[in-house]
């Protein structure tokens, strides 16, 4: 089927390319609902088809066939004249699929250079890889073409060979990302430092005003196991970034133009972290209540994972909030060409 030659003008439209599960909230299922709440039209292409995420202990399904992913992307990006405002890429299990995605997105960007490509280089967490190692070189080739990346601390280590134990390590990691890949926006979604137990940090930079401007958020760590948070972060970031950008475009007073403000990205990240805090509190509260009612669930991997699924629908009001409960700290930047 081919759509008429219509450009879908007037809607915010994103193509989300990541994992697909029938049950629960990871991958496309975690990113789609928040984006739709923010009035985005979301088209999805799966990279895997699973019954549920791997934390359940047992799952059915398989990785998609590269040719299938290519056909889907070709139909959406080339054949049907659909114009996307953004492309969101997440979990990709192997090199063959990630190469297909890279080729298709790069070809689309040549014809649509203004499309925002938000790349989450999903490779692993806490020292453990959960994709084929041969994706690393392709991710490194992709990053310079993206608008922004959202790695976790372990993924920064893979991309830079810098292990993050301190805030200075995180800054050095971001500086090396900037030097190696030249990307204009990067966020380490969360990391811990040895001297601050119970606290998580999020650090990023944006080149909105030319040189990279660094920002840092810190927020309390919640006990518990949460899955799909990285996918939620990237989906929300796209929504909040566009919202903040549109708001500033409509503020035309001379005073607004002359006022030096935090970058759009820094403001968006603060809103994302605030939204996610509410989602995780709601998720933890629900799981604790379920375990209190039936303590036997704690010994059943499937039921426990089910109780810990993100409470996205129940947090829909919070997901739309434009407030930030956290205050950004703005750090001295780094200069291009410095040794790391």
UniProtKB/Swiss-Prot annotation:
InterPro entries: PM/HMP-P_kinase-1, PyrdxlKinase, Ribokinase-like. ATP binds at residues 189-190, 218-230. Gene3D superfamilies: 3.40.1190.20. SUPFAM superfamilies: Ribokinase-like. It catalyses: pyridoxal + ATP = pyridoxal 5'-phosphate + ADP + H(+). Substrate binds at residues 19, 130, 231. Its main location: cytoplasm. It is found in: Cytoplasm; Nucleus. CDD domains: pyridoxal_pyridoxamine_kinase. Its cofactor is a divalent metal cation. Keywords: ATP-binding, Cytoplasm, Kinase, Metal-binding, Nucleotide-binding, Nucleus, Transferase, Zinc. Its EC number is 2.7.1.35. The keyword Nucleus applies. Belongs to the pyridoxine kinase family. This is Putative pyridoxal kinase C18.10. It comes from Schizosaccharomyces pombe (strain 972 / ATCC 24843) (Fission yeast).
